[in-house]
């Protein structure tokens, strides 16, 4: 778990070195409080699940239905203003990042959203998520974060 923690801290450090764009730039620098960092093992099958719909049709109205927690699928397909991606795009991206023949070699952790102001935007409305994925076969980390507002 310590290597995952270091990878998450490094990912946030990299975000701080980049030019930020977006509609909410209230934090010019993302901070990390390591003492508040918590994680839990995340099931591989659940991580790659591609079937949870986040919309419910109620008469002529499309209503957002938030899952009990943000899933990777939700983060990819349901940002505040939508994306033009297909399920096929989701599968292609995952095949590039995590070739299916090696998925059993993945170690996935889901992180809490109380240790960094990176999550403040998402806490306002859309939601937050952060996963650290270690690919034992390729000896690399992939960090996926989500935190947006309108």
Protein language model regions, located:
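Acidic, proline/glycine-rich low-complexity IDRs
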Residues: 87-150
């Amino acid at each position: 778990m310590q290597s995952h923690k270091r990878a998450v801290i490094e990912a946030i450090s990299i975000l701080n070195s980049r030019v930020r764009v977006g509609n909410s730039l209230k934090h010019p620098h993302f901070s990390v409080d390591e003492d508040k960092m918590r994680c839990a093992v995340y099931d591989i099958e659940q991580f790659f699940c591609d079937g949870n719909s986040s919309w419910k049709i109620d008469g002529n109205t499309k209503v957002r239905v938030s899952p009990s927690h943000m899933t990777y699928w939700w983060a990819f397909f349901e940002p505040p203003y939508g994306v033009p991606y297909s399920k096929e795009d989701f599968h292609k991206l995952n095949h590039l990042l995590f070739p299916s023949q090696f998925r059993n070699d993945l170690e996935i952790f889901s992180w809490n959203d109380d240790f960094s102001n990176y999550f403040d935007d998402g806490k306002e409305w859309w939601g937050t998520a952060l996963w650290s994925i270690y690919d034992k076969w390729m000896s690399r980390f992939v960090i996926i974060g989500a935190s947006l507002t309108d």
